[in-house]
Amino acid sequence: MAEIKNYTLNFGPQHPAAHGVLRLVLELDGEVIQRADPHIGLLHRATEKLAETKTFIQSVPYMDRLDYVSMMVNEHGYVMAIEKLLGIDVPVRAQYIRVMFDEITRVLNHLMWIGAHALDVGAMAVFLYAFREREDLMDVYEAVSGARMHAAYYRPGGVYRDLPDAMPQYKASKIRNAKALSKMNENRQGSLLDFIDDFFTRFPKCVDEYETLLTDNRIWKQRLVGIGVVSPERALNLGMTGAMLRGSGIEWDLRKKQPYEVYDKLDFDIPVGVNGDCYDRYLVRVEEMRQSTRIVKQCVEWLRKNPGPVMIDNHKVAPPSRVGMKSNMEELIHHFKLFTEGFHVPEGEAYAAVEHPKGEFGIYLISDGANKPYRLKIRAPGYAHLSTLDEMARGHMIADAVTIIGTQDIVFGEVDR
């Protein structure tokens, strides 16, 4: 009698649970995965190569488009690498603004993750709830930079501009009556900081809501507990970082272990898992949202009390003010040179890493003294995590592969770069 062979199945790239353009070639024995082979490159846009043809400042918007749900954190790694090479110190107010927006971005990312992960597993409501909160945070992005997603707000030497004193309000339209309008604009009467403060006062209750729906939910636990278990040793050897590593019980967070900006002045905790399964990683990320809330609250408090510059006053790197430019010839020349030729960065190399919502996001930058990078290497956390999929999915069912892709929080912009 002929023996039954394993059969091969293509998962994606046109698949709702494939998180973009993931293509998996699965080798199955019945419904059990024997091997999972990720095929990447379907969203490759040559970001690293493009950076070699652009001035240092022109590449900032490209960073937004790497992991397109954690926009500002990508920029942060890039501008930190440039600042290391230039040897410049960023004003403290700008550092607090950066840290605040890093944490807002972390919450944005985790809201997207919890919504998509739950939807993949079969829970619909959390997805809608998460997007309700994301909307407010997108408005914060828009208030400060003019764009809801691709902000290009961080610049070498600081941030693009200080926080606005007023929050944009909803306007009257045919579909909104006066009562609805006044309710929508209720928390938008003050400054941007007031709005952020109001949001993060409400937000812990929202996180409790998600936990009510998921944490003790029988079906959720059946789908996540004991799935994709990674031991602490394997997690380290596989190059995992971020929530994936902490879910396996290793307390490693760049914000604590290699503090950058003002993280060493802030009070927060690092959540750590025990079993290293999908459920633990879920709990770690939910707790991270609570810790981000603490950090943002501290930043808001500090920013209210301490006005000051948000950009260095070295006009070789940072553009001069509009007012100065109209009255001073030198400043006009600086402005012209900056936006045509860009600034020249001293010869050398630098590596800057930030604690990205998905793990360690690193930028390795080599300069040959020109106005463009000689080479830019992006260390994307999702790339290392996706390569562990084969090991994590082996011996599980097809349905569990969806859970494992969800727990890895894969975004293809950064995997393919």
Curated annotation (Swiss-Prot):
SUPFAM superfamilies: HydB/Nqo4-like (SSF56762)
Gene: nuoD
GO molecular function: NAD binding; NADH:ubiquinone reductase (non-electrogenic) activity; quinone binding
Highest taxon listed in the record's lineage: Bacteria
Pfam family, one: Complex1_49kDa
Disulfide bond annotation, renumbered to this chain: none
Family label: Belongs to the complex I 49 kDa subunit family.
Lineage, uppermost ranks: Bacteria, Pseudomonadati, Pseudomonadota, Betaproteobacteria, Burkholderiales
Subunit-structure text: NDH-1 is composed of 14 different subunits. Subunits NuoB, C, D, E, F, and G constitute the peripheral sector of the complex.
InterPro entries linked: NADH_Q_OxRdtase_suD (IPR001135), NADH_UbQ_OxRdtase_49kDa_CS (IPR014029), NDH1_su_D/H (IPR022885), NiFe-Hase_large (IPR029014)
This enzyme's EC code(s): 7.1.1.-
Membrane topology: Peripheral membrane protein
Name listed for the protein in its UniProt record: NADH-quinone oxidoreductase subunit D
Keywords from the UniProt entry: Cell inner membrane, Cell membrane, Membrane, NAD, Quinone, Translocase, Transport, Ubiquinone
Broadest EC class assigned to this enzyme: translocase
Subcellular location: Cell inner membrane
Keyword Translocase appears in the UniProt entry: yes
Catalytic reaction annotation: a quinone + NADH + 5 H(+)(in) = a quinol + NAD(+) + 4 H(+)(out)
Function: NDH-1 shuttles electrons from NADH, via FMN and iron-sulfur (Fe-S) centers, to quinones in the respiratory chain. The immediate electron acceptor for the enzyme in this species is believed to be ubiquinone. Couples the redox reaction to proton translocation (for every two electrons transferred, four hydrogen ions are translocated across the cytoplasmic membrane), and thus conserves the redox energy in a proton gradient.
GO CC, any one term: plasma membrane
